[in-house]
Swiss-Prot record:
It catalyses: Preferential cleavage: hydrophobic, preferably aromatic, residues in P1 and P1' positions. Cleaves 1-Phe-|-Val-2, 4-Gln-|-His-5, 13-Glu-|-Ala-14, 14-Ala-|-Leu-15, 15-Leu-|-Tyr-16, 16-Tyr-|-Leu-17, 23-Gly-|-Phe-24, 24-Phe-|-Phe-25 and 25-Phe-|-Tyr-26 bonds in the B chain of insulin. Residues 76-385 form the Peptidase A1 domain. It comes from Homo sapiens. PROSITE patterns: ASP_PROTEASE, PEPTIDASE_A1. Its EC number is 3.4.23.1. Residues 16-62 form a propeptide. GO terms for molecular function: aspartic-type endopeptidase activity. This is Pepsin A-4. One of its GO terms (cellular component) is multivesicular body lumen. It is found in: Secreted. It comes from the Eukaryota. CDD domains: pepsin_A.
Amino acid sequence: MKWLLLLGLVALSECIMYKVPLIRKKSLRRTLSERGLLKDFLKKHNLNPARKYFPQWEAPTLVDEQPLENYLDMEYFGTIGIGTPAQDFTVVFDTGSSNLWVPSVYCSSLACTNHNRFNPEDSSTYQSTSETVSITYGTGSMTGILGYDTVQVGGISDTNQIFGLSETEPGSFLYYAPFDGILGLAYPSISSSGATPVFDNIWNQGLVSQDLFSVYLSADDQSGSVVIFGGIDSSYYTGSLNWVPVTVEGYWQITVDSITMNGEAIACAEGCQAIVDTGTSLLTGPTSPIANIQSDIGASENSDGDMVVSCSAISSLPDIVFTINGVQYPVPPSAYILQSEGSCISGFQGMNLPTESGELWILGDVFIRQYFTVFDRANNQVGLAPVA
């Protein structure tokens, strides 16, 4: 009997998962639009989401660039704590980048005045460095320093974690941002300044039993979304997980067999590469096939630059099917048409990302909301299953 109890306790210990609740908030684009600031912002900032995946590096000064405008449409955010005692921050959990950064008390920019700021002097475990970091986004940049401290993530105490502390931030962009900073969950090979990503540090310290994390994004306007570190919760999906090999260990890059509509190939007919990215809200692809998709679904550009469709037409639009590793993943019009305050906006975006293996597609939140996603570092694979 004692052995049975012991085995039960061991099994239970191996299934411990750490969950970080994500809250769905109003995106920065929507906030700017409601305040009548979006048109002016778009005029001043030449948005180029592709720069997220091809940053410009200046190694001699340890300055790294990563465009912040990629987070213009983000809606899902979680809370972490940094320091001892912990100071709380709202961050984007981003599988399309690898660094952690938050505002600091050294920042006097307007954007920092209405966000949480980390104070190293209030933390007994903070360790400073002489390294600097700069994250650019067009006409301005976030500059700061790198330091080490304990990061609290969903009940995990991640000690000796390197992160960026901002000293200047571009007010015209970040002042209205619904988040304080970014927590990257991609591979360490794309980490700026060679900083160890949060999940790598967690795994290296033996703080989780499985070298993987998983994501569930709820369509609910408020709650229900979650990032799970070190485990998989089958209550969030139906059927079985289908596993897809990672083709390049940088971003979470996989092969897509084809993209079809009404049984006909509309893109990626001979296969293509895609990145599964929680830090991108839309489904993006090369401008030419995306333009064809927009035409097929009857989308046209409005004065804000959004591709809009008639809300009454949604029920008659077809699914768009992504075939991945031989399995079909339909995305229905209720998912790829985003409805907000009487407007219906296409969830597709054109973006050219040329690589040696061809143009990249980005499977952002529009896709991930439909499919529970496991990011398996141990086996370098992505698991997908329909959400429950």
